[in-house]
């Protein structure tokens, strides 16, 4: 016997946004949200340090999707239908005015995620939506006309349409879909190089980091345990699966001056040697790097920092240029980025119709949010994917 028109598994951002949209667009539908945790929207509550980086400003969707290592191409169309602009309009229309920071991140003007949560719960509460917490699903199967959902408690539910909006869950594989393995994405790197970490606090605004053919550029921060910063986070995200295969033990190459070739750096050093032959190599960096970092690089090049420039043979200058453009750092592990625990993995994207977010394999089955093999570089982009897929799945269910 059908107990609900729609069951949504997962009371996170995507699931609750879908419930809120269904409450407004199809109030006649009986919607049941099943949440494994004690409260819905737990990750939204702590995102952005409790402030909730709701989305990111967007002037061009084609540029926006470049922030998604997996799923960017598939989200291009959906973002044109319900993207950052529409998200801002929706939340502001539901009592959550937003403010844009200098870095493009959008937060509630009140600086608290509770306003986002209250807006979603209040909107869902105006419709025919029931939310059950501490409720774990363990099995799903299709029958003619709907789906059966078996709970860990032994209870069985039935619905006409099913939206899965939760990450993980062995029950998904029973529906015939391919699950891409989940591995961490968006993390910083640890290193065993104590001389390097002794430089903690140094920021270099523009570097290129590379591993196994992958490259990323941006700022890099040396930390007490390793490296962080936009360049590292981008590399960790786009290289998530490759780095997982190494068990997070690999060598990362750092080019401290990506705007110049190694030959250009060498020529700069050669000119400085000609102009300032009596200066000691360690007292000044001709290429604009900080003194502490410069001293490490010349030491790794095998050059004594007290040596005068004029006494350095061309071979020594070549070695210094090689360190500037190809410093090798041993990586021995990873750390999560701040409070964000992003993973890649989930339903294989080609098995989903991104016009409707309906399964291409099982009619009446929809996906949104973390269950999809989509991830982004920062929390605001990840939440935008949740809002967009949740909204479009709900719209499709409402009109279907």
Feature locations, PLM:
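Beta1/beta-strand and adjacent pyrophosphate-binding region of the FAD-binding site
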Residues: 1-14, 32
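Glycine-rich FAD pyrophosphate-binding loop
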Residues: 7, 23-49
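Short hydrophobic core segments
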Residues: 7-9, 34, 137, 149, ...
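An active-site-proximal "capping" alpha-helix that borders the catalytic cofactor pocket
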Residues: 8, 18, 171-175, 384-400
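Residue-level recognition of phosphate/Mg2+-coordinating polar/acidic sites
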Residues: 24-25, 39, 60-62, 80, ...
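A conserved beta-strand/loop capping segment in the N-terminal third of enzymes
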Residues: 45-114
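A conserved short coil-to-beta-strand element within the FAD-binding core of flavoproteins
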Residues: 133-147
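Glycine-rich loop(s) and the adjacent beta-strand/alpha-helix scaffold that form part
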Residues: 161-197
